[in-house]
Design a protein with these regions (language model features):
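Aromatic- and carboxylate-lined catalytic core of secreted/periplasmic carbohydrate-active enzymes
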Residues: 371-381, 389-514, 525-542
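Short strand-edge motifs at loop-to-beta-strand transitions and within beta-strands
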Residues: 520-522
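Extended substrate-binding grooves/exosites of carbohydrate-active enzymes
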Residues: 45, 52-98, 231, 235, ...
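Hydrophobic h-region of N-terminal signal peptides that target proteins for export
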Residues: 29-37
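Extracellular glycoside hydrolase catalytic/binding regions
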Residues: 248-252, 261-427
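Short, Lys/Arg-enriched N-terminal segments with co-localized hydrophobic residues
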Residues: 4-16
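Active-site mouth of glycoside hydrolases
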Residues: 45-326
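Bacterial N-terminal signal peptides that target proteins for export
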Residues: 13-25
Length: 542
């Protein structure tokens, strides 16, 4: 089984023709370059003025959040109450395609085509589909039911885990799992996508007993003494690295992930899916990443995800804060009434109270949250888990947000199949179709300009529902949430002429809006009372 792979020794490089002096000079060059480069290597992912970019072009849109369990099983189809999502490390022997072993090449093609160029990965809740009905029964045999969700840890040759298979060895790793992630990351760099890699999956530690019974670190499932409890809640114990054995197991695993993915420029590293853990573990995780960077001379995109108190503490840290390239604002928000929902870290708050519940937000409250952090940290990219709704997607963009992480299920086959089956090809998820016109508009007209644009307070009417991104004197993008009149201050660009166009985010249509001249205010009236965007582009041809 792929999960029982051996640990491979690093290949040693022999360079007998090099002198000792040559080696020292090369090492010094690497260290100097690494100390000054703020993004990935040339051709890979960079953070430019708070935007994800590659080769000078913005990467904006949705990110698919991966599937945790399930997949197509012959004779039963999908689980009707749970249409599964894409999973990079799902393995269906002999079957390739949606809901089986994903075709990574076709998947990444679909991502950049259909408006979700990002993908957020974490390992699955259990290995095989016998656990899909969420029972906690100990398996008496190894009669597994594919497809499998491969885990990062390898199986040992000792004992029997709760799922009837050999116990895990937490110091050995699954080569198939990491090969899949490396190949996906390589394709992301090639095509302009991003892998958001979660090292852990907190959901298994808190939500329900069925999610924890097969977890590799549970005492019944591994050969090491992890000190973990036999039942949930288990998160705070898992994150307690004052236990020497558990601390070293964490460090070994974290470094394995970095050894496998650290060369991949289009990867943003995140501590965990649904992380509501303590500040202490976040500090330990970041310190382990920074130590690896120092040892290797390589540079990582470190993402920060957690509760507001933990996120704010790290960003205020004079050592750790500057190393953060990406902020995830998923586990706190402003409600529609303006009050703050912000649970504290380290309280074992489950995902059903943060990432999974319907959010009582408005476009205005979402804009407020994103804009606040963009103002405080203008050079860091911002992502957030959120439902994909047109007005909120635009509020997120106008506040300076880079990518909306969404739990997008496979689209139904066209025409629908009976019984319920996955599509034969990767077609656009319904959620991605919501922003498809906007995604196409940005790629066609603003891909090179958006990295130089920032939220700007130059709107002079309906400020509570009209927002602007601007590169002064060159490009202006104004979003009117409810249509109506749009007035912007162009006083700092006297004499400059701008071509103005209306953009309909529902249809993707562009229509003329006239000409504006800098040096004062410019006013426009939306074609109707629905949301519209106004695009002003500097020109000398008018």
């Amino acid at each position: 089984m792929p999960g029982e792979g051996k640990t491979f020794a690093h290949k040693r490089e022999t360079m007998e023709d090099r002198t000792v002096l040559h080696r020292m000079i090369a090492a010094l060059v690497i260290l100097v370059v690494a100390s000054h480069v703020t993004g990935a290597e040339k051709g890979g992912l960079r953070i430019t003025n708070g935007w994800f970019t590659q080769d000078g072009r913005v990467i904006w849109g949705c990110a698919q959040h991966n599937g945790w369990w399930g997949g197509y099983r012959q004779g039963t189809g999908w689980i009707r109450q749970y249409k599964v999502r894409t999973a990079l490390c799902r393995r269906a022997p002999g079957r390739v395609g949606p809901s089986f072993t994903e075709d990574l090449d076709k998947l990444t093609d679909a991502m950049v085509r259909y408006g979700y160029p990002g993908f957020e990965h974490n390992y699955g809740l259990w290995y095989d589909r016998r656990r899909d009905n969420h029972d906690v029964q100990r398996r008496t045999d190894a009669n597994v039911q594919p497809p499998f969700l491969e885990q990062p840890w390898a199986r040992s040759e000792e004992g029997t885990a709760w799922d009837g298979l050999p116990k895990y060895d937490l110091e050995r790793f699954n080569p198939w799992y990491f090969a899949r992630l490396k190949e996906f990351a390589r394709l992301c760099r090639k095509k302009g996508g991003i892998l958001f890699h979660n090292f852990y999956m907190q959901h298994a530690l808190l939500e329900t007993p069925a999610h924890y019974v097969d977890f590799p670190w549970r005492p019944a499932n591994c050969v090491q003494d992890t000190g973990m409890p036999d039942v949930i809640p288990a998160a705070n114990v898992f994150y307690d690295v004052t236990n020497d054995a558990r601390r070293e197991l964490h460090r070994t695993y974290i470094r394995k992930c970095l050894d496998e993915l650290g060369d991949q420029t289009n990867v943003v590293h995140l501590v965990s899916e649904e992380y509501t853990g303590p500040l202490s573990f976040m500090e330990f995780w970041i310190d382990t990443l920074i130590a690896w960077e120092r040892e290797t001379g390589k540079r990582l995109h470190i993402g920060l995800v957690g509760t507001k108190d933990v996120v704010d503490a790290i960003l205020a840290d004079p050592v750790r804060g500057p190393r953060i390239s990406t902020i995830c604002l998923s586990y706190w928000w402003y409600k529609a009434d303006g009050t703050l929902f912000a649970p504290q870290g380290g309280r074992e708050v489950a995902g059903r109270y943060t990432g999974n519940l319907p959010r009582e937000t408005t476009p205005q409250s979402l804009y407020r949250q994103i804009r606040e952090y963009r103002r405080l940290y203008p050079d860091k990219a911002i992502i957030q888990h959120h439902e994909v709704q047109l007005e909120k997607a635009w509020a997120f963009l106008m506040g300076g947000g880079s990518m909306i992480v969404a739990r997008m299920q496979y689209a139904d086959s066209v025409p629908p199949k009976q019984p319920w089956e996955p599509p034969d090809e990767y077609i656009a998820p319904p959620e991605a179709l919501v922003i498809q016109p906007t995604y196409d508009f940005i790629r066609a007209h603003l891909a090179a300009a958006l990295p130089h644009m920032r939220p700007a307070d130059i709107v002079r009417d309906n400020e509570d529902r009209t927002w602007c991104l601007a590169e002064k004197g060159k490009e202006y993008l104004v979003f009117a949430l409810r249509g109506g009149s749009v007035t912007i201050d162009l006083g700092e660009t006297p004499g400059q002429r701008f071509q103005a166009q209306w953009f309909d985010p529902r249809s993707g249509d562009l229509s003329p809006a006239g000409v504006a001249t800098g040096g004062g205010t410019a006013s426009f009236t939306c074609p109707d009372d629905r949301c519209r965007a106004l695009w002003l582009h500097a020109t000398n041809d008018l």
